[in-house]
A protein has these predicted regions:
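Catalytic machinery of carbohydrate-active enzymes
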Residues: 1-168
Length: 168
């Protein structure tokens, strides 16, 4: 057993959010290139590009406006973050998840998941669905692992990888 309360007492940086970092604390070393979470598929929301973009850890080198050329874009997360992205991506839809289980079901049922360093991305990693990480230049701790798992710093990378995953 792992006493996760001990994490609060250790002199470690809890801001480091790479999934593999948990292995140092737990002594458990899963194959991060394989699926290590399970859930059901969502019954109603399938085939969307699922987006979660928090205000924290944004990459200010990129712009989401090209997403207006794509369909079935679904934002999950906080409504104020949705409202902010909706100013740029006019065809973006919002869904307020009931809980993290439903969020996982939606991610599992997605065409792929796009996000910055937030809860949705590690869930997508665990479910091993296609995923795209908006890497944060000033805090590049989160890293994708495995097949069809990418990150980007620059606009041309973002657009190329988005198109690739959209057409899988």
């Amino acid at each position: 057993d792992v006493n996760f309360d001990l994490i609060r007492e250790l002199p470690i940086n809890l801001l480091f959010d790479n999934t593999s970092y948990a292995s140092i604390l737990t002594g458990v070393y899963p194959d991060l290139t394989s699926q290590f979470l399970e859930c059901e598929s969502h019954k109603k929301l399938e085939g969307y590009v699922v987006i979660q973009r928090t205000f924290r850890y944004r990459n200010h080198f990129i712009n989401y406006d090209f997403l207006n050329n794509y369909k079935k874009l679904l934002f999950i997360g906080i409504e104020s973050e949705y409202d902010d992205l909706k100013k740029t991506v006019k065809n973006l839809e919002f869904y307020d998840c009931l809980d993290f289980v439903e969020m996982s079901e939606i991610i599992k049922s997605s065409k792929f998941t796009l996000g910055n360093s937030s809860l949705a991305f590690p869930i997508a990693e665990g479910l091993n669905v296609p995923r795209l990480l908006e890497a944060c230049p000033y805090f590049p701790a989160a890293q994708p692992h495995g097949k069809n798992a990418f990150n980007f710093y620059f606009q041309n990378q973002f657009e190329k990888l988005f198109k690739y995953l959209y057409n899988l």
